[in-house]
Amino acid sequence: MGKKKTDKIVFENVKILDAGAKGVSVAKAPDGKVIFLPNVVPGDVVDVQTMKKRKAYYEGKAIKIHEFSEHRIEPVCEHFGACGGCKWQNMKYSQQLFYKNQEVYNNLKRIGKIELPEFEPILGSEKQLFYRNKMEFGFSNARWMTDAEIQSGTEFDNKNALGFHIPRMWDKILDIEKCHLQEDPSNEIRNEIKRFANENNLTFFNARAVEGLLRTLMIRTASTGEIMVLIQFFENDKNGIELMMNFLAERFPQITSLQYVINQKLNDTLYDQDIILFKGRDYILEEMEGLHFSINAKSFYQTNSDQAYELYKITREFAGLTGNETVYDLYTGTGTIAQFVSKKAKKVIGVEAVPEAIIDAKANAERNNITNCEFYVGDMKNVFNDEFINQHGQPDVIITDPPRDGMHKDVVEMLLKTDVPKIVYVSCNSATQARDLALMDEKYKVVRVRPVDMFPQTHHVENVVLLEKR
């Protein structure tokens, strides 16, 4: 039954039924409406307090747990619940994989409405913690206070924080002591930066007043052991910048690439900023199957290096190359997949919209002594056309790995026009992948599907699909 609590409703003894989109779970209210709520596990029985009432559903939170799900485990992170990162850290990993697989299947079936083969088993990640090679943190002088801190009555003179944005709160940062997503020295570097900044009165960013020296921190690591650290400063305070950068260079001599940016825009994106090298080189090296890839501050690289290797192996297997094929790699990025499959292809043509990525792709190919890869820059819908195919030859296999929005309809139409026998579609968003597969269904059938978990403790999942001409 429901009872009023101020202007909100409390539903008692509600069973959590399923895991839904964006990492929230799903239940049903007594009035039949769906309830979406975070930090619970399917199988839990809870009292739910509604936070928002919509026309067809409620948004709520669990205020009391009566029964624990058999799939529930204790989160390892002290920040779980407040931090919006690892939303499934309280769920057994085997069950996380179940729901990720279910999400892919439901999207392909409900959105794509296409005939599907039996899914191949979702590939789980050997590492479920400390698997990320890139983390970004924010500085703020408006630290988010947790419920426990507020209830303690403790006065906090220092409100500086270095950590993650609270979901839906652009001006609040949750101070992070230990993050379980990136291996050390990531935590040590972050905590030492915070300590040094506080001790030396270096100001943390104030998002409302738009002032302060320290703005963001990025740490990238590689399987080679190399480390990149980049700090975004908001104010052009030469003394403060040199003080922090000299400290980092001396305190962490193992940093391979130490860089900074002075960013006085309203947003903190790096891609239109001039990056200043303070010490070392402006890139780190990642290694995969004997190939080396340079990663600079602006490079896109899969954030789970070990699982990226598994993803690329599946992609290469689906392509079924014999050494005689011309392969097109659409949305090639820095050319990682293109070079990874090049050993088993006659020629690989990579296309990418970001000029800096193509510069990296060409440099990586030269570094790896790969001579059968060519890379071209341009907007995919404008570059991938009849003229391009006439110039570079009819492809035997096309690999496409678009961003979350999927492929532009003009690209899909061109794919159909190429009449290529085989397409391997790698996706980080099975919903847009399903939409694109539906557009190709008349000419191509899905013959293999394999989801890959790149992001344990989250709801995100990659998916690889092999299409063959009907």
What are these regions (language model features)?
Residues S25-P30, G163-I166, A361:
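Short, acidic/hydrophobic/Gly-rich beta-strand patch recurrent on exposed beta strands
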Residues M1-H79, E374:
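Terminal RNA-binding accessory module
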Residues G43, Q182, N304:
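Short, conserved phosphate/pyrophosphate- and ester-handling motifs at nucleotide-, phospho-/glycolipid
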Residues I219, G225-F234, H292-N296:
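Short, aliphatic-rich beta-strand segments
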Residues K64-E74, G81-T203:
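Extended interfacial segments that mediate partner engagement and assembly in macromolecular machines
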Residues G2-N13, A21, S25, N236-R470:
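Rossmann-like S-adenosyl-L-methionine
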Residues D171-A207, E211-L213, T221, E235-Q259:
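Internal alpha/beta scaffold segment
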